[in-house]
Regions:
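Glycine-rich anion/phosphate-binding loop at the beta-strand->alpha-helix junction
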Residues: 3-122
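Internal helix-turn-beta structural module
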Residues: 108-177
Length: 177
């Protein structure tokens, strides 16, 4: 693409681990964890889609192939798979949160596309600019940061505290994750 003066998009994955169950809400539309994550990541320019866990593959599967079975390991509840991507019913389930997002090719091209001069209405080529042929690696870091903001906010809502030490203490006494 770079040699041709073009650009490419791509798909990246973010995995958040070590989170407790119960972040988010199963009742309030604006507090559901998957909705908050999606809103924050999709607010970044050029991101065009997001999936959590198995995501769009679920459309081709039966419920018995999608839903994660629950077990007991002698100390805590576990899931035998993580097709839900760490979020069920709007809340975290203590499994890794797995997110994939797609970014479109960036629009600035060294080999410009056809356009129209808005003053003269004449056909023109778009302005040539210095550009990267692929911004997906950099954009994935931005998306990871957006996810961190959402998770930090959800942790504060659930556990509170004036300091990190207080919040860690609240997390430690609330359950075995």
């Amino acid at each position: 693409a770079k040699a041709e003066g073009d650009s490419v998009g791509g798909i990246f994955e973010i995995i958040a681990t070590g989170l407790p169950y119960g972040l988010g809400s199963h009742t309030q539309w604006d507090k559901k964890l998957h909705a908050r994550i999606t809103e924050s990541i999709m607010s970044v320019n050029a991101f065009k889609g997001i999936e959590i866990g198995m995501g769009f593959e679920e459309a081709e599967k039966l419920g018995s192939e999608v839903h994660d079975e629950i077990g007991w390991d002698g100390e805590k509840y576990i899931r035998h798979s993580n097709n839900a991507g760490g979020i069920e019913g709007g809340m975290s389930n203590a499994q890794p949160i797995v997110i994939r997002a797609v970014m479109k090719p960036i629009p600035t091209l060294i080999k410009p596309l056809r356009s129209v001069d808005i003053e003269t209405k004449e056909d023109k080529l778009a302005h040539k600019e210095r550009t990267d042929s692929c911004s997906v690696p950099a954009a994935s870091i931005v998306a990871e940061s957006m996810l961190c903001f959402v998770l930090a906010d959800a942790l504060l809502e659930k556990f509170g505290g004036d300091t990190m030490e207080q919040m860690k203490a609240h997390i430690n006494i609330s359950g075995n994750y």
